[in-house]
């Protein structure tokens, strides 16, 4: 493997594990997403990934002793422990709870066993019964095929991580939908495949269109179709038990809940939505938006999330009697539930960071975003009620400032124009709500572009060489929609996500945004972001989006 010099030894060494040959996936140390823009970010990524990836296995006496030593050292240094807890709490709030044992668990084990006659046995009993991981993020090589249970393998990865990878629901799903060379899961008459798809994730978030496309996936075969269907059914049943409080417990799950709102709103309000939003093609468009949204979420949390391992002018003061032109009548896609949830998440983020004592120099755009979402929600509600939007034009006659013997009639918009609010005010609000980079206002081309990439799953078995599943966004598409409501028929134009899914063989460096962007942008000036390659050179569209392009 190619490896940064600082990790050359670690890339070549693999930890020996208990019973099964577990290997640390050192390709995960490739800095990517937002962590490639500076040497500081790259160093932070690698250092934090080390703490996240390397386990102190419970079943290893030596590693368990090391874990206790580290935990006790932290307890003996309260200032450092406080800093650690503050960082850990912020990550938990934004991404999710730890999926592995943490130093605090080992301190609790010591406390629980202090009065036990056999302290060592009591400690091990506590750790054995403590939080079990739900996501397997390590490569496992088995001595035999089809004998070891996936659940047993997962338990064998149990141990302390200094900064545990965070439990995220979508990685849990892909983990439950895949397997390597383990035996069939209990109650399954077929083995699951080693690879997953965004279609499955979107299906579990409520997209009926995504579910209808799963049987066309290249890994959906007669030998595993029943297993995939059963796993999807089991996970859907599990999801049905989640309350809104469950979905809102941290920001990451809240973003999934917002994506879910795109699909739920579409289904619940189908008959009251505009005709163009009732077609199968629109379902594909909503899927593309949701998948692009999800890709950005995975991109933002790529370090911490636990990945499964299968813009006025003035006149000259003369008489201007021109009429006010007809306003360009825009339209806001009325995804009311998603907008309400976005507003909630922004408020939760702002309040949560403030409560934890963070005073971020770039936090103020959140308040602009919240105000913008209030406006978007208001207009969406009015559109759904088929209300007429207002723009009142008034004519005022006064003396011509250039010729007192003549009169001058001027025309102007009286008060607030709904159409100008949609056309200009909201556009400015979007600009005001953009996050400000902590390094300063000047961005490299890479960080100005819409095309980003996130690896979300790694899978293999004895019949399928190891591959990495990537989710990417590309250059946004221009979308035209024919609207006919109380404000009259019109053709509206806007932008929508482009989303791509593909796999690449495992090994070496994992793909970065820079690698992915060569498919859409020409190389050159570090700050020239939007010099595009020919359309013919762009990646192929996934089959489930072809309905948006007349099947092409």
Spell out what each predicted region is.
Residues 1-552:
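Long, non-catalytic protein-protein interaction scaffolds
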